[in-house]
Amino acid sequence: MTEDQLEQQCLEWFAEGGWEVAHGPDLAPDGEAPERADYRQVLLLADLEAAIRRINPHLPQSSVEQAVAVVRKPESLDVVVSNRDFHRLLLEGVPVEYKALTPALSQRERGEERLIQDRAFLVDFGDLNSNRFRAINQFTLEGSKQLRRPDVVCFINGLPLAVLELKSPGAENVNIWDAYNQIQTYKDECSDLFAYNEAAIISDGYLARVGSLTASQERYMPWRTLKHEDDKPLLEWQLETMVRGFFDRELFLDYIRYFVIFETDSDKLIKKIAGYHQFHAVREAVRATVIAARDMSDAGISEKRATYGDEVLPGSKKAGVVWHTQGSGKSISMCCYAGKLLQQPEMNNPTLIVVTDRNDLDGQLFATFSAARELLKQEPVQADDRDTLRRLLSE
């Protein structure tokens, strides 16, 4: 199989998963159906503007244009900083303002004009069908040295959120790490594309790995599941599992929303994303917690638990235990669990207490949670003793 054949097969898997598929040259400035002004443009602006109007129908056109202007021009020259800033906009919306009239007290009077502060949301995480998912191959970009052409770029509402670089499974002396090196070249020469990136995938068909913007080779991980932890098909191509599993549209939105964390390590900003084991464990743990926290009068569990627990009883207050090996990223799992659980309406704004058995671990974990404040949507606090904990819980 050639690289082009693998690319076409990849696009077929995307299409079967509900993604729109397009050929990059057709959308190019000189293409048959151009959607880009030039090869430097990494956003599909018509898609982005249409999505903002669709998701935020109450906003005037001036605010839609404000939001587009903010998104298309990253403020920082550091691509990782720009990426963090964009991720914040993706989750929290773009701040916009517009003028509106307050209701008049009578028909003869004119309402008072006032300035409204609002947010324009770029993605509808609650309604899958409000978003436009597109997988586009051969998306040519003007790099700092020459034209570059990523194999597949995945767009949601005109935003390039993932890049796939493929290598021929039949080529000698070529493997997925050549694709990894190609991704690094794109980051250096086409940094604007990666200001919006949430995942980079490298594959030769047989093998496939996913990594974050700052991930080293060791941090590029396989994706072994489709819908849930027990859904591990014995497919010949790991790339097929990646496309059908990681890029399942519902799961991909959930991933972006709850499973991305930024941390600072020795004054260097790094981006971390969850592995498949963390992703599915957290999703199951949140589901079980919501059920266990129900009133006893609520209906029973709607489906069987995964294999690591037969059932969870509604209202039992016993959600279960997540067991992962040393070095598997339990701190990230805990942060993602907290971030997702705190945003479940059934939990009624819960208070979470994290208990550790070592002082050094307590400090490390608190630092991890503090770095994830955007995911948590609040500032975590640390209690050094019981009295402090009692005071914090009483506030």
Residue ranges and their predicted role:
Residues 371-395:
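Inter-Walker segment of RecA-like/P-loop motor cores
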Residues 102-106:
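Positively charged N-terminal leader segments that act as targeting/secretion signals
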Residues 107-113:
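A cross-taxon signal for low-complexity, glycine/charged-rich
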Residues 1-5, 11-101, 114-351, 356, ...:
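ATP-dependent helicase/translocase motor core
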